[in-house]
Curated annotation (Swiss-Prot):
CDD domains: F-box_AtFBW1-like. Residues 91-137 form the F-box domain. It comes from Arabidopsis thaliana. It comes from the Eukaryota. This is Putative F-box protein At1g33530. InterPro entries: F-box-assoc_interact_dom, F-box-like_dom_sf, F-box_dom, SCF_F-box_component. The lineage of its organism: Eukaryota, Viridiplantae, Streptophyta, Embryophyta, Tracheophyta.
Amino acid sequence: MTFSIEKLVDLKRKKWQSKLQNTKKQVLGRCLTNFSRLLSFRKKQETNGKSPRCSKATLAVVVHPTASTTHDDFLRKKQERSGKSPSCSETTLAVELPDVLVEEILQRLPVKYLVRLKSISKGWKSLIESDHLAEKHLRLLEKKYGLKEIKITVERSTSKSICIKFFSRRSGMNAINSDSDDLLRVPGSCNGLVCVYELDSVYIYLLNPMTGVTRTLTPPRGTKLSVGFGIDVVTGTYKVMVLYGFDRVGTVVFDLDTNKWRQRYKTAGPMPLSCIPTPERNPVFVNGSLFWLLASDFSEILVMDLHTEKFRTLSQPNDMDDVDVSSGYIYMWSLEDRLCVSNVRQGLHSYVWVLVQDELSEKWERTRFNLLGHVFPPLSLNSAWFSQTLVSPYQLSSSTCIGSRQRQNSTSALFSRNGDTGAMDAPIELHISVSTPMMPL
């Protein structure tokens, strides 16, 4: 008898949990529909040349919990102004939602809409720029769609701005390599943040093309041999690592959590003098580590763990002993967070060596691969993969987006997407100012 009662209680609990989930989905669906109507209304006003305006009743669909204006206050003020009772259509949308539902709605919106919604109020701006929402937004994209990467290339626009061009995977390799800038380097892109530096300048820039935010870093003295960018997968801290040469080869790391440069040898010992990365290739960030091809030969690969900040070396695939890295035919890249090495001299139908890692060992596996434009990364040093995400955890130094120039069939302010695949039909250009002038050519 006792077992039957417990079973009945358990069934009732599951039934109510199911009803709660269905109710939550229905509320979210209605709110997202109202959001879509609101954004369509704003877009229509912008198209007609009008300044987009939204009533407080409309925005109350997802009013922030800290807002002081209640629904009753709104009705009272409206009655005082017009002497009329608010219509049913105006009061239908005036619904306050709890914090959880507000975040559930916002994290499902595209990045470009969230950027526009920051201008509604200080409360909205604070919520959208919070690390918590940015992290949830990123994880939801990864879970639902995977990080749909596109190709970007960075070029000098003026002495105080750079131009970021966005390309679809279907654009192929030639579109990326056609206008290569010999002095700009893009050592990496991680979670929607892009690292850029110049060979003839001391500055390093961190950009978020989706929000227009930039951060300028000035590393210690010395000639930059290579710059790497990635995230510590243990702590979630973004780090910029610089190999430099002055009177000897050294390494400095910038931690974006502490906002300080530190000499790496203080914690991990000096870097081997023979481990000089080749300037013809950018480092590759894979699963919390940076990988470099060495300039001396291709017998080893230099590896730095961004958590421990210690260096080690990795042996090359055995089948590639006869290939000279200085020839420029060896390319190292990341695919599905795995390190890949390929010989581009073999053409599009090439063998690719994939590094398979686990807790106890790591080994190379060779596979035949079709290196088409939608899979193979850009070859030029000023290009990289890029994921369109909200992540911009360091808003302390902001800059102004100068503008965007559209090409070909693009129809939106920044992006033109294929409705079926979600892919970009680009190329599209975005000009972002930097807080320090870029050195003229």
